[in-house]
Amino acid sequence: MKILVTNDDGVHSPGLRLLYQFALSLGDVDVVAPESPKSATGLGITLHKPLRMYEVDLCGFRAIATSGTPSDTVYLATFGLGRKYDIVLSGINLGDNTSLQVILSSGTLGAAFQAALLGIPALAYSAYLENWNELLNNKEAVEIMGAVVSSTASYVLKNGMPQGVDVISVNFPRRLGRGVRAKLVKAAKLRYAQQVVERVDPRGVRYYWLYGRDLAPEPETDVYVVLKEGGIAITPLTLNLNAVDAHREVDMDSLNRMVEYINASL
């Protein structure tokens, strides 16, 4: 099996290294990722300037860094390098990607959506963390995360993406320990109340920061499962944004079997 691993936190992110290590048992792995953090770039691609690719040594394995966005990396790996992939794994993102509000701007999900547009099964992984030390200093948590990545990816490689699903988003809670369970849930609409802060620089020119304040999570959504229940949210997503053709058959049996398969690995 040919696997592409990418992310939006940049080629030097510990999360990318973890995802690469977790994927090694599944097949032949290529790592192609942005040279620097490209968070919140969504499905954006680079059309206004040329793109560069170059090899980097990441403490024992080689990766290809690109000057583009996460979405660009999928294009470059597929068409620039001429590779044919069986699956694309994006992440592991530092910070959760829960709610449609976040999903639609996420570079992690953007890479997965780009893969899906090219007909490649794709999974995106994100963790509700403030820094990587929270995870890397916890061997049990790393093992659980590895089991989830391995089980989700191997399920899709063996069975294909469930009918009606284009991308699967996996969000890990802050604390991963024995007893944690995966749960199949929809994405909430909102994660944050959007706000803008206006400030003035030393030259008297105004500038602005965009940020968000946490909203109360809606029950039975990805936000609620990760933030309130401390579970692993498994959220199936579709590329179909057509309101006229919104109805789409989804193979819930396959999705439920996937979650059972994940939980059996924990």
UniProtKB/Swiss-Prot annotation:
Report the top EC class in one word.
hydrolase
Q: Please name the Gene3D superfamilies in this protein's record.
A: Survival protein SurE-like phosphatase/nucleotidase (3.40.1210.10)
Subcellular localization, as worded in the UniProt entry: Cytoplasm
Thermal dependence: Optimum temperature is above 90 degrees Celsius.
Keyword field: Cobalt, Cytoplasm, Hydrolase, Magnesium, Manganese, Metal-binding, Nucleotide-binding
Principal subcellular localisation of the protein: cytoplasm
Q: What is its EC number?
A: 3.1.3.5
Task: Tell me how the cofactor is bound.
Answer: Binds 1 divalent metal cation per subunit. Most active with Co(2+), and may utilize Mg(2+) or Mn(2+), though with less activity.
Cofactor(s) the protein needs: Co(2+); Mg(2+); Mn(2+)
**Which amino acids does the record list as binding a divalent metal cation?**
8-9, 39, 93
Q: Name one GO molecular function term.
A: GMP 5'-nucleotidase activity
Catalytic activity from the UniProt record: a ribonucleoside 5'-phosphate + H2O = a ribonucleoside + phosphate; a 2'-deoxyribonucleoside 5'-phosphate + H2O = a 2'-deoxyribonucleoside + phosphate; GMP + H2O = guanosine + phosphate; AMP + H2O = adenosine + phosphate
Entry GO CC: cytoplasm
Question: Is Manganese tagged as a keyword?
Answer: yes
Could you give the subunit structure recorded for this chain? Homodimer.
Q: Which NCBIfam families match?
A: PRK13934.1 (NF010544), surE (TIGR00087)
What role is this protein assigned?
Answer: Nucleotidase that shows the greatest phosphatase activity on purine (deoxy)nucleoside 5'-monophosphates, particularly the substrates 5'-GMP, 5'-AMP and 2'-deoxy-5'-AMP.
Q: Which family does it belong to?
A: Belongs to the SurE nucleotidase family.
Q: What is this protein called?
A: 5'-nucleotidase SurE 1
Q: Which organism is it from?
A: Pyrobaculum aerophilum (strain ATCC 51768 / DSM 7523 / JCM 9630 / CIP 104966 / NBRC 100827 / IM2)
The gene is: surE1
